[in-house]
Amino acid sequence: MTTVAKEYVRIDPFTYEIIRNGLRTSAEEMFYAFGKAARSPVIYETLDYASAITDNSGNLVAQANGVPGFLGVLDYAVRDLISCRPDLLDEFYIANIPYNGGTHLNDVTIILPLLYDGDIDMFIVNKGHWSEIGGMRFGSWSPDATEIFQEGTQIPNVKLTNGGVPDREVVEMIKANSRTPELTVGDMEAQLASMRVAKRRILEMYSKYGRNVVLKSVTNMLEDSKKRSLELLKAFPHGEFYVEDFIDDDGINEEPIKVKLKLTVTDDSFVADFTGSSKAVAGSINSPLPATVSAVRVVYVAAVDPHSDANEGTFYPIKVIAPEGSIFNPSKPYPTSTYWESMSYATDLVWHALVDSVPTKLSAGHYLTVGATIVGGTDDYRKKNEPFAIVEPQPGGWGACYNSDGESVLVCSGDGETYAASAEVIEKTLPIRVERFSLNTEDAVSRGKYRGGLGMIKEYRILSSEASFSGSFGRSRFPAWGIQGGGEGTPNYFEITGSKKLKGRRIGGLKLKRNDLIRIKTGSGGSWGDPKDRDRNLIERDKKYEYLGGATD
């Protein structure tokens, strides 16, 4: 089996580079093919998915991301399949169990073993957010869930196809458990089609260069990345770093939740130890271990080698310690459907631990939360009682850098290449009117020599007779941190007006009526440096564009 520890094999360097890039572009082509064919806006518009190729042991070889937060889950999913199904065939397999190889039930992984002459050479993997997979709330993820059984359909490494064709009984089971069955199955079929593209590209390389040469190239890719990663780590600041923070609450209880990190960096290891963090909580913010590993990998790449390949060799020095039963490694039946709240903190803890050591690479704290929202129901405004759902992240303000203001209205660290859905797509396809999408200049921005970036304000007007709203926003009570005297950011929250009046940070399945208004406000990032040192020209610019939330100094 191919692993990063195998003996380095020398091959023609030109052929090697062609194959290396061929594998990367195969993953990328799979990624774009899925986006083009998908039915749900959360896939084709928001890009909440990822595609990858692993070796036959599940070691990540190449990955294409909409969501960097998936950097640690696809290889875990493959290893989980290998351990559960020793009898793997040339068929597609489907899974979404969070604890062993996932995130939350909405994120459905499909895996295709690449068999050649009876042997498994590689695995082709695709993970996408299905908008609806059952559960207690429309859209499936549930801020008020207290066990995984409330969050949707659990699929434990099931064989999805027979002879490459979706098994009718499995498909009917999936449809029966979805409030939007046509969208759900349409996205599943798009995943399968995109994976066939990647398989075809790999077999084309087999035909052109030879199977053994391609497999040797895989081994060398991982070994080269490992060597590069270790060389860069030697030049990276070493030491032990300690950080603590608090998550607002778990959506069930009001008490803040303590999280902590001890980060140890040596010549050949990058150890993130979350021992001492809270135990798994009653609410759905628990982060499965694969998601926690992803959180650490995201910062490692950003701080150590932003230009590295996303593969097992690059991540070789990383070790994550998260005690079983903790908020960063929950076990069944703890809910995980809004796992991103804790996962984002895992990223932020590592980020905060390193920022003083590598100030030119990392920023002050950002608004952090995915700020995920679901608006769904039955469309009796545009269409004849068809179900609809829009699931999306909400962008906000990033932290200031050592030499510049923070970026405004970007998605959080775990969401990377994802987008908030455009107003045009929403209004064309859903019974919703987007009445505002602007910078958040109403809440005072954080202050510093360099200020944090601004959040945003978005307003949705409900046009159907009824709808439901779910939202999960972190950093509402504990805003983004500043650095070197810079101020904190501002909170994230939502407001509802109309038939109900409400201001909050976490809610599941709130019933709304026609003309109700959902108002989403994300916060600013933290600032860098003493506000007294801010350049006067920058202050005047902020006043001119009304960035200061009404302040005059």
Predicted regions and their residues:
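Glycine/proline-enriched, intrinsically flexible loops and inter-domain linkers
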Residues: 2-89, 97-116, 120-553
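Glycine-rich phosphate-binding loop of nucleotide-binding enzymes
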Residues: 92
